[in-house]
Amino acid sequence: MSNITIGVIGYGYWGPNIVRNFFNAPNCTVKAVADGRPERLAVLAKVFPSINGVKTGDEIINDKEIDAVVVATPVYTHFALAKKALENGKHVLIEKP
């Protein structure tokens, strides 16, 4: 099985759990996590120093090395982020609901 490179948008309530699970999953590499709050990216850097913290979801969506995007942001942002990721050829997982 080949490796899949993942980017996560949102490191608030569910983001840390999603990152942890994909980080520990075989054949997965979490390359980047996007969050607009610097304090959340600081926590990410302490817990997962090998993962790049970025400020916007667009940085993840436009990254040619990322195969799949997890959208773990407030519900009202899901459609726009998922649509943009799909239009850029990414696989998408949207955190419920």
Regions found by a protein language model. Give the residues of each.
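N-terminal Rossmann-like dinucleotide-binding module
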Residues: 1-48
